């Protein structure tokens, strides 16, 4: 395994690579810290949490969930919520949130600590909500229950996010994962150009969990429930639903790997059994 995500991705040409990518922060938090536990209170606390979770689950990708960082920070700093609500522009809450110095400093400390613990053996990936999704979430933090997000707002969000991730540009990050939701639009990937440019500048791999159409050639990996034909794109088969329902899981083809989100309330014995299915 390598510190760079692109070096570890399988390719349709037959080049082997990683096999199991997990989204496990909610499950690991409940299991290791309890229902109310928060690993983001400090960098040492997060490192302890991360090393325990990583040792238990042994994923092929080490993920730091930046969305979780900000959910924790906003919950612990109510004054920031008020500042995020100060202006009516749809992108302002996200802009104000990402400008906050405290989370930037904490993320830098966490990435430094986690990267040192990995020692270049596993790619370190920052997982972020995709711009449209993060706009909506930040608006919710600011008390806005309904917002209309157009392509211009998505482009603005991508600019703010690109500026934000530069804070860790000098650190050994292997890639970025953008996670969409059901509100994603066909033009969203093209609107994320600032993030694409930053990823290319720092030689980070770029993965998307969602449904990409136009612009998918900008990605190194696309993660979804159904494979996409053509190209040299590494494809993550999202088997979360099948895995935890006990349904059969598709065999991997060339250039494919498994992606699974572990339910927060899953039983540890069941989790280890199901992960064994993916690794068999």
List each language-model region with its residue ranges:
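Glycine-rich, proline-tolerant flexible connector loops at the mouths of alpha/beta enzymes
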Residues: 42-43, 61-102, 175-186
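Active-site-proximal, glycine-rich beta->alpha crossover segments in alpha/beta enzymes
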Residues: 74-167
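N-terminal basic, low-complexity leaders that serve as flexible interaction/assembly modules and, when applicable
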Residues: 1-71, 257-280
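Short, well-ordered coil/turn segments that N-cap beta-strands
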Residues: 14-18, 56-61, 119-124, 172-174, ...
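Catalytic-face loop-and-helix region of soluble metabolic enzyme cores
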Residues: 209-280
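Generic structural signal for well-ordered alpha-helices
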Residues: 6-9, 47-54, 107-115, 162-165, ...
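A cross-domain feature marking catalytic cores of carbohydrate-active enzymes
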Residues: 24-26, 66, 126-130, 180, ...
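A contiguous, surface-oriented mixed alpha/beta subdomain in the mid-to-C-terminal portion of proteins
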Residues: 149, 162-225
């Amino acid at each position: 395994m390598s510190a760079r995500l692109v070096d570890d991705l399988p390719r349709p040409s037959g080049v082997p690579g990683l096999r199991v990518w997990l989204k496990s922060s909610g499950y690991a938090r409940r299991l290791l810290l309890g229902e109310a536990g928060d690993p983001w209170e400090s960098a040492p606390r997060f490192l302890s949490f991360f090393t325990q979770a990583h040792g238990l689950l042994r994923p092929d990708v080490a993920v730091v969930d930046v969305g979780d960082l900000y959910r924790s920070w906003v919950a612990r700093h109510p004054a920031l919520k008020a500042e995020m609500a100060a202006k009516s522009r749809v992108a302002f809450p996200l802009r104000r949130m990402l400008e906050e110095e405290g989370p930037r400093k904490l993320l830098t400390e966490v990435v430094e600590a986690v990267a040192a613990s990995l020692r270049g053996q596993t790619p370190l990936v920052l997982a972020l909500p995709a711009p449209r999704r993060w706009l909506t979430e930040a608006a919710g933090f600011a008390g806005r229950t309904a917002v209309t997000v157009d392509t211009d707002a998505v482009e603005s969000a991508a600019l703010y996010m690109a500026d934000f991730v530069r804070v860790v540009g000098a650190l050994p990050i292997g890639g970025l994962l953008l996670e969409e939701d059901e509100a994603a639009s066909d033009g969203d990937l093209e609107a994320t150009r600032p993030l694409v440019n930053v990823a290319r500048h720092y030689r980070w791999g770029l993965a998307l969990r969602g449904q990409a159409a136009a612009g998918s050639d900008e990605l190194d990996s696309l993660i979804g429930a159904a494979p996409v034909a053509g190209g040299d794109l590494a494809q993550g088969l999202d088997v979360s639903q099948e895995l935890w329902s006990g349904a059969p899981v598709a065999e991997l083809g060339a250039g494919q790997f498994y992606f699974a989100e572990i339910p927060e309330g899953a039983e540890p014995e069941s989790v280890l059994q199901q992960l064994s299915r993916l690794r068999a």
